[in-house]
Amino acid sequence: MSEVRLIDSKNLEFSVRGDSPGMAYVARALTPDVSPNMGIGFARWEGAEVSWQVLYDEVVFVIEGCFELTANGQKYEVRPGQMLWIPEGTELIYGGHALFGYVVHPGNWKEIHGL
């Protein structure tokens, strides 16, 4: 049985997910072996724009700064105290300058999609 865990973003290893003209970093806080149902982590966006089609349902909640997401011709600016729900299959562009947390379901989406 899993235990309750306190996760501090300062203790995680962030990997690069985007580059020039800005940078983007992502740190997964729980691995699929801990929770295959949910993936959680932190991300820091520093002006990068990353295009993606999500293969999972996702919630993004902003801790500091302004996270930007463009989807279906609409641009969303998400600020501290706000969150954004993104349904599976959405084609989007992540952007902005922000530290944010994320939750994805299913957490083992890479395994499911053979990635």
What positions do the PLM features span?
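Short acidic-glycine-tyrosine-enriched beta hairpin
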Residues: 73-89
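A short, N-terminal "cap"/entry segment at the start of jelly-roll beta-barrel domains
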Residues: 1-42
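Short, conserved beta-strand element in jelly-roll/cupin
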Residues: 44-45, 53-69
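Ligand-binding loop in jelly-roll beta-barrel domains
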Residues: 88-112
